[in-house]
Design a protein with these regions (language model features):
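Short, glycine/polar-rich helix-capping loops at beta-to-alpha or helix-loop-helix junctions
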Residues: 54-58, 118-123, 290-295
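Cofactor-binding loop segments of dinucleotide-utilizing enzymes, especially the Rossmann-like FAD-
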Residues: 22, 52, 93, 118, ...
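Glycine-rich, small/acidic residue-mixed loop/short-helix segments
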Residues: 302
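Active-site cofactor/cluster-binding pocket
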Residues: 69-129
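A structured phosphate/pyrophosphate-recognition subdomain
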Residues: 2-25, 35-41, 123-268, 274-278, ...
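Short, hinge-like loop/turn segments at secondary-structure boundaries
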Residues: 64-68, 108, 131-134, 287
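Anionic-ligand anchoring segments at beta-strand to alpha-helix junctions in alpha/beta enzyme folds, i.e.
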Residues: 18-78, 82-84, 236
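Primary mode marks residue(s) on the alpha4-beta5-alpha5 output face of response regulator receiver
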Residues: 281-284
Length: 335
């Protein structure tokens, strides 16, 4: 994988460019792809954003999100564009396997493939150009860097600002996670100077749910959370019945994993949702507990040092027991 700065001089020549992200995209994935979209179209490129799956409805406020193709719904149209694309940008994931049904198509394409991502252990052999930086707060911050370092800061408009700010806010936990370095605040300051209304974006992300989601949250915290004080760990589980009862949609469980971290002494949180095909895990930690290694070792996943995800084909009951056994095996790291 060659350094991404080699692309800077090639930006001015119009091309056909596809941009994609990981499945079930969050604010950083959707924000970074749409932010890059609004940058590239200013050069006259033909640009198409493709999501491997559907996304949370609370992301529908983002400028031009209505132009994003859901691969599961528009496979033929998406494939046609991908097969004729000159460039493919892959944002907020570093292995094609994170794109579900889209993965085989991405792997077989012969176009120039470009990675912009901040997760650990990238598959660098799959990309022509790229930048991978685990020290960055978000992929949105990296897209901002890409634009500025390419010499085109003047092309950052309000659409780009809103998209990139959304991803930074989400991935830094509203600027409270350890990934919030000085560079993040410098970026936000520059976006504010361009006219960004940060409260508008924050409200769109966090004050945009339905009543059922708040009642669901109350149910989960009251009835589905177990605190294991001797291991400084909390686990939350969501059953299929819970999802049906409260009519939970894509994105409605976002952020719930963070709530137990407010309990004094908690160093690790495990959050599992019982889906039809598998059990989906999310992990959050404080201090020196490595969620990425934990997720890879026990649940075939990965991510960041203090935030990662995984999956399990076992039943909900069995996967919870597996988690409890895993934390016992790592108890010295949780003291």
């Amino acid at each position: 994988m060659r350094p991404i700065h080699e692309l800077y001089t090639k930006l001015s020549e119009p091309r056909k460019i596809a941009i994609t992200m990981h499945q079930k995209p969050d604010a950083d994935a959707m924000g970074s792809t749409l932010g890059l979209y609004h940058f590239l179209v200013q050069f006259g490129h033909e640009v198409q954003v493709i999501s491997p799956t559907n996304w949370a409805r609370w992301l529908d406020w983002m400028p031009n999100v209505n132009k994003v193709l859901d691969y599961e719904l528009h496979k033929t149209k998406a494939d046609e564009f991908l097969e004729s694309a000159d460039w493919l940008f892959c944002l907020d994931f570093n292995h094609f396997g994170r794109t579900k049904l889209l993965a085989p198509k991405l792997a077989e394409l012969n176009c120039t493939k470009i990675l912009i991502d901040h997760h650990q252990e990238p598959d660098v052999q799959s990309f022509t150009f790229g930048v991978s930086s685990t020290g960055k707060s978000s992929t949105c911050e990296m897209v901002f860097d890409f634009i500025v370092q390419s010499g085109h800061r003047d092309k950052i408009n309000i659409f780009i600002s809103e998209c990139l700010y959304a991803g930074v806010v989400a991935d830094t936990g509203s600027f409270r996670f350890s990934s919030t370095h000085a560079s993040v605040h410098h970026m936000v300051a520059s976006l504010k100077e361009l006219g960004l209304q940060h409260t508008k974006v924050h409200e769109a992300l966090y004050d945009n749910f339905l009543e059922n989601r708040l009642r669901f949250l109350g149910h989960v915290l009251s009835n589905r959370m177990e605190v294991i004080y001797e291991l400084n760990t909390a686990v939350i589980y969501i059953t299929k019945a819970d999802l049906l009862k409260y009519n939970i949609k894509t994105g409605d469980t976002e952020g719930i994993v963070n709530y137990p971290q407010s309990i004094q002494g908690i160093k690790l949180v495990g959050f599992v949702v019982d889906r039809d095909e598998e059990r989906k895990w999310s992990f959050r930690s404080k201090g020196n507990f490595d969620c990425n290694t934990f997720a890879r070792k026990y649940f075939g996943g990965g991510g960041h040092f203090n935030a990662a995800g995984g999956q399990d084909k076992e039943s909900l009951e069995k996967t919870i027991q597996k988690f409890k056994q895993a934390i016992r095996e790592n108890k010295e790291l949780l003291q």
